[in-house]
Amino acid sequence: MATMKIPMTVPSPRVDADQLFKAFKGRGCDTSVIINILAHRNATQRALIEQEYETKFSDDLRKRLHSELHGHLKKAVLLWMPEAVERDASILKRSLRGAVTDHKAIAEIICTRSGSQLRQIKQVYSNTFGVKLEEDIESEASGNHKRVLLAYLNTTRYEGPEIDNASVENDARTLKSAVARKHKSDDQTLIQIFTDRSRTHLVAVRSTYRSMYGKELGKAIRDETRGNFEHVLLTILQCAENSCFYFAKALRKSMKGLGTDDTALIRIVVTRAEVDMQFIITEYRKRYKKTLYNAVHSDTTSHYRTFLLSLLGPNV
């Protein structure tokens, strides 16, 4: 459920384009106008504004925003402009080929998207960057972490609600054996189950594992795996159980302690604002006894703060 508020009566794309053009004129730009328009338009409306702006002014709106805005606000607005699949592809490209590989962002995008979304992302990635997503993962990831990502990308998973209890129990026993023996060959068993099974099935396996062995499957994974391999398996498991809690926890981590992980904060707020942010907000308040709105307000400043808070909606 989306949180950003769209006006009851939305101006036409031409009116919005005119207002943006005026906001860019003169020394500097009127950032408030840019935020008031773009933070309160959905993806379809933003695309129409872009088309109208280019048609009327023979200018690329995103390039204009890139030249006029600065800092974290610029990053947030530019990430907000594309439709979801294009945005995800660009996040993956930057995460894979940036100065530092952002393994957590890669796992977040790949392991929280549906099979149909992943197929679209792969197509857009290839069309936009002239290289397959799998090829960049081959180049930048390694070991079991790479194997999980590639398997998750290329496996067709059932996405319905039905489960087979016998298969669930068998997977619980197989996972117990895989994490108990610590044989290298058992890693492939973990990869196969975590990347091949539906989210509903994995939730049932997690519950059955707890009932059969008196231990959380997540703890077993943490005890017996390490590094990026551990992180991507836990991401798959946590998102199968409750993806909104996964995002709430990631937001909390981005703002906890000294400093702010603005890259993660921007990525999650922007990518979830039109999807399930209302449920993430509810999870955040329930788990941390503080509203996400107040947390973001405390960790950001100026127009950057205004833009993110506009995407979050009212303080609830």
From Swiss-Prot:
The cross-references to PROSITE patterns, in alphabetical order and at most eight, read:
ANNEXIN_1, ANNEXIN_2
| Phosphothreonine modified-residue sites | T112
A molecular function annotated in GO for this UniProt entry is: phospholipid binding
Which UniProt keyword terms apply here?
Acetylation, Annexin, Calcium, Calcium/phospholipid-binding, Metal-binding, Phosphoprotein, Repeat
Sites of N-acetylalanine modification: A2
Q: Which Gene3D superfamilies does the protein's record reference? A: Annexin
Give the induction annotation.
Answer: Up-regulated by cold, heat shock, dehydration and salt stresses.
Q: Which InterPro entries match?
A: Annexin, Annexin_repeat, Annexin_repeat_CS, Annexin_sf
Residues modified as Phosphotyrosine: Y284
**UniProt-annotated binding residues for Ca(2+) 3:** T300
Which Pfam families does the UniProt entry name for this protein? Annexin
**Gene Ontology biological-process annotations:** pollen development; pollen germination; pollen tube growth; response to cold; response to heat; response to red or far red light; response to salt stress; response to water deprivation
- Binding positions (Ca(2+) 1): F24, G26, G28, E68
The written remark on domains in the entry is: A pair of annexin repeats may form one binding site for calcium and phospholipid.
- Name the UniProt record assigns to this protein: Annexin D5
Origin organism is: Arabidopsis thaliana (Mouse-ear cress)
Gene designation per UniProt: ANN5
